[in-house]
Swiss-Prot record:
CDD domains: Trp-synth_B (cd06446). It comes from the Bacteria. GO terms for cellular component: cytoplasm. The modification N6-(pyridoxal phosphate)lysine is found at K98. Tetramer of two alpha and two beta chains. InterPro entries: Trp_synth_b_CS, Trp_synth_beta, Trp_synth_beta/beta-like, TrpB-like_PALP, TrpB-like_PALP_sf. It comes from Bradyrhizobium sp. (strain ORS 278). The gene is trpB. It is an enzyme of class 4 (lyase). SUPFAM superfamilies: Tryptophan synthase beta subunit-like PLP-dependent enzymes (SSF53686). Disulfide bonds: none annotated. This is Tryptophan synthase beta chain. Transmembrane segments: none annotated.
Amino acid sequence: MTTAIPNSYRSGPDERGHFGIFGGRFVAETLMPLILDLEKAYADAKADPAFQGEMNSYRTHYVGRPSPLYYAERLTEHLGGAKIYFKRDELNHTGSHKVNNVLGQIMLARRMGKKRIIAETGAGQHGVATATLCARFGLDCVVYMGAVDVERQQPNVLRMEMLGAKVIPVQSGARTLKDAMNEALRDWVTNVHNTFYCIGTVAGPHPYPMMVRDFQSVIGQETRTQMQEAEGRLPDSLVACIGGGSNAMGLFHPFLDDPSVEIFGVEAAGHGLTQLHAASIAGGRPGVLHGNRTYLLMDDDGQIAEAHSISAGLDYPGIGPEHSWLHEAKRVTYLSATDDEALDAFLLLSRLEGIIPALEPAHAVAKVMQLAPNKPKDHLMVVNLCGRGDKDVPQVGEILRKRAKQS
């Protein structure tokens, strides 16, 4: 299928939440009134200067924005091509980009009078950000997390509990992010009157993909300004990792209508694209999951396939619907990096720049290691460093110990 190239890549979604054939709102009847209320509340808040002003104040004084745009001099020298900059969203309060979105949604929940917040989480970063903002505003917080992720992301589980959240391990399915989202949706259907569902990525039923994108777009907006200050022009390329794709959409969206800017999204290729992986664009096809139509990993019978990634935050069998549309419109190039490539990038960045990245953005760095050497030295490449690696140190340490024993 070919997608017509629009006048603007930034005009979506339409009033029903569609990006071309993707998106929409496929939800239970009991949820539809809530979804429509949320859409109206968000439109009102977006048009309210007081809401925007309060959010900007918290961004500055609580989150710590703007995050720096950092020239990675040693990595640039090592790779011998493009000049590499990192957008350092791992320096935000809570350690990732997730707080950008959660701040906006929790402020919206308060505006709507909701006292109980639920969230799903994979790596735990969205859960930590949600627990943090709930603590700040005195709201009840319940976080659903796959039991496998609870085991591999223990530091974040402890952080959530210390912040006062109730963490519920999900034992169904593959016990990872998809299953956590299923349980959160079940909770929401049961508790519609007092509960706000804070979705962590650019997925779910409309208006969530649009809303999360808007809250995350501060990343790309700052990058435009900072790159003009640093280099006097726009970057030549952008690179970001993709699970659901909120950090990537936050960086990409403000640049979509700049044809001179190449854009690369990096999915998780896991053990390889012919084996277990989480690369929905590379290995999936359109279907419906969690309230929206998008590219999904499916078996021959159309059932959702199990995803795999070394990174809990990319371990999801789908991708945000706007990414699916940008893929078909050929505005963004979607690549993938394996577990081993991400691990090598994790170690390289730690040792060259003194920055321990999360395993999620390590996938983006892995592709930079392949892309940058083939670019001229005046090519400006911006990479979204969307999370810090504290949560992954125990897991990576265990992998390295096993490697050492085998060698």
